[in-house]
Amino acid sequence: MTFQLKIYQQRCLDELAKYLRRTWQLQDADTAFYEHTRRTYHHVEALRGLPYVCVRVPTGGGKPALAAYAVGLAAENLLRADKCLVLWLAPTTQIVDQTMRALQDKHHPYRRALDEAFEGCVTVMDLKSALDLQRGTLESDTVIIVSTMAALRVGDMDGRKIYEDSGVLMSNFDGLTETQQSLLENANGLTRPARSLANLLRLRRPLIIVDEAHNARTPLSFESLARFNPSCILEFTATPETTHNPEQEHFASNVLHHVSAAELKAEN
C-alpha cells in the first residue's frame, strides 16, 4: 500500500518535532510552546508541566496517519528513547476497532510508519490484552495500547480491571527502586502497591495519543489521564476547545499547529 504524506501533513509533523525537540532542550513545555506560537500555554492542574499540545486538522485530513508518525517523533525528539509505551485513545469502540486493524496490519501505512520508526519492533493490543502485558514485550518493543477514554475510568467495568492487583503482571514490578515504588497506588484492601496495569503505566510513563481530543477535555478525563503519569499528551482533532475558563470547566487546548480548510482542499 503506497502512501505519501501531503504537504500540510508533513508541515504538521515538522512543527511537532520542532516543539518536542525544544521542550527537551529547555525541559519546559510552557516556554517551548510560547516560543513556537507566541501564545499562552494553558496548564491543566492535574498535569502541570507536561507537554500537552494539540494539532488541529480538519475532518478528512488524516489525523490517524499523523498520530502514527507522531509516535516516532516523540520517541526521538522528546523521550530520547528507541522504544516507548503508548496509550492511544479513540472516541468510540468502533474507531478503536478500526485503529486496531490498521495498526496491526503490517502493510497499512500507519503500521509501516511505526515499523520504520522502531525497526519493526512494534506490538499493538487492546485494553483487555494489555491486562496480560509482559515485561519482556515492553523491553523489546514499542507497545501501543488502543482504548477509549471511557474504558479507563474507574466506574467502567474494564476500567476497574486496570486498577486491580494481578499476578500476571508481577514480573513488571520486580526490582523497583524506592523512588519507583513511591509512584505506585496501593491496591484496595492491601498495604502494598497494586501490581496493576494502571501502576505499570505509571512506571513506564506512556506517551498518550488522543484522537478527537474535544471529547476528552473534562476534569474527569484529566483525572483519569493523570493517574497514568504520562510523559506527553498529543491531541489530534478538527474541533479543539478554544475557550479557557476552568471555573466553568472549559479548558482550552494548546493548539500548536492548525491546518486550514483551504490547505486541505488544495491537496485533495
Language-model-derived ranges and their functions:
Residues M1-N268:
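RecA-like P-loop NTPase motor core of helicase/translocase proteins
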